[in-house]
Amino acid sequence: MIKKDRVKRGGVIKTHIRVVEGYRPGPGLPTKQRTIKSFGYLEDQPDPEAFMAMVAKFDDNFKDTVPLRIEVAANAMMYGEENRRQNYGYKFLEAVYNLLEINSFIENFEKSRKFRVEYSPCDIFKFLVFARVLHPDSKRASCQLKDGFYGMCTDFTLPDVYRSLDHFADFEVELQRHLNERVKETIGRDLSYAFYDVTNYFFEIDFPNGEEDLRKRGVSKEHRTDPIVAMGLFMDSNGLPVNMSMFPGNTSDSLTLQPTMKDVKDSYGLGRLIVVADKGLNSSKNINAIVNNGDGFVFSQIIKGKKGQRYNEKLFDQSGWTSNEQGTYRYKLFEEEYEGKDKDGKKEIRVRKVLLYWKKTEADMAKRKREEKLEKAARSVKNNAYSIKKGVDEYTKEAIVDKETGEILGNTKKLRSVNLEKAEHDAMYDGYFCIISSELEYDERKMRQVYGGLWQIEQSFRIMKTDLYARPVFVRKNEHIRAHFLICFIALLIIRIIQHRMGEKALSAERIARTLGAATCQVLKGGIIHLDDVGGAIAFQKALNKKGEIVDTLAYSDRDEIAMDYKLIQDTFGTSLYNIYPRQELFNKFLKNITVA
């Protein structure tokens, strides 16, 4: 039936049109209504009469559907095939996978290497990519679920999977080149800026296996002591991954940029690049290499310590700042000369743009964090306790004193105290930030805008670690480690392409995976498919915050968040199927029509 709901949107009363049906959620329970399809607001339609005629036709077709008679044996067992749920949500991932023509690449690579085995590397690779999105786990645990995908060919064993990893590592570089070409052809690659960052992933092992092992102890981003591997990631201006490179865990972040950048430019035939990175990649060697290659850079710059002292005079000079009306933001923009080296190692004077700015919100946040650390330091000193946790001992200091007089002497007794001098010194830099760039024509807004794009690569790392469970890593061999991260890279690329297609309505990686994981079905007798409810999470009501952004409130709505997300995904892929019991031929046709336009 057609239901018209009067709702208030933007201060205006509108008529929300939807087709609903009645159902009984359980024996003895009152009937409820559920939405079959939502058509939007009547007042927003250019031709309301034609619009309602279309809704009525949909309603009639839905009501006129021939009822199905499904027979179920009274002695049917719980663990029979008819009662097995299989996922079909992976088909939306497969549409992007097919767009990238990964199967064709692997098949051609096998032919060129005359690689012949009894199992299908194509099937294994595809399965591992989809499992990484929907059920991220170890290779062993993932293979235990291989029969849970509708229509997917999974005729392989766990040993086949491990053997395939060696093969996958062989085409790590070539596949990334292929993916770049496919992205350029089908979506468009915007490399006006190349965003670069490095992270690392840990292994729950005690010791690496030798000098050649990628797993090394190094500076962990998560402050762990386990062996790690490092990953350098390039991303384009659309937020789509471009290139991934792996390094031993003890490699300094700053040493990864030049080899990765050279590989990207040589492999992809790129012209001038403007590299955007944080201060961890900002070194004189990197800057010299970038400029000598005819490329550009936008880096954040340390303003504390020896490396940042050159800016202290301008930073603490109260004149020359440009401020906003509220006094919550101010900046200085100027050019400076610096000493660089040409390709022959000869020194020369070069010029770059420097932006110093201060934000009150950042200053307030830095103050709060420091006060919290000082409280921890005071408790640590009081209890004479040490900690390996980050920040706990940042504001403590030690002195060797004479037990009798307190005079500082050699080798008698350690006295710990709160380092208030360091806290006062750090407070001077609260809220200040520095960006440097080779692009002399950039103004203040442009420099902040370009550097601000780095959040997308940071988000990509979070997706890989949190949503794709890229760590801890369970494989051991270098080839298997490279294959594992290649699979994670492609899973990330597929998610990013889906988000790119969604535009401003893009869902988070977690919600995409949750929704597609909930798209399950059962194959019944007589060529009937039972589609499970793609739902199960109550949506919260929305409201505008002080910044004019739409955010969740604490109040429940009458809608299902997963169901809404599934509709958005179907709309993105140009499909629409909400029948509970479609015939198998109709269902297969629906799956076949899931494509990326």
Regions found by a protein language model. Name each.
Residues 2-3, 16, 26, 103-597:
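Anion-binding and metal-coordination hotspots
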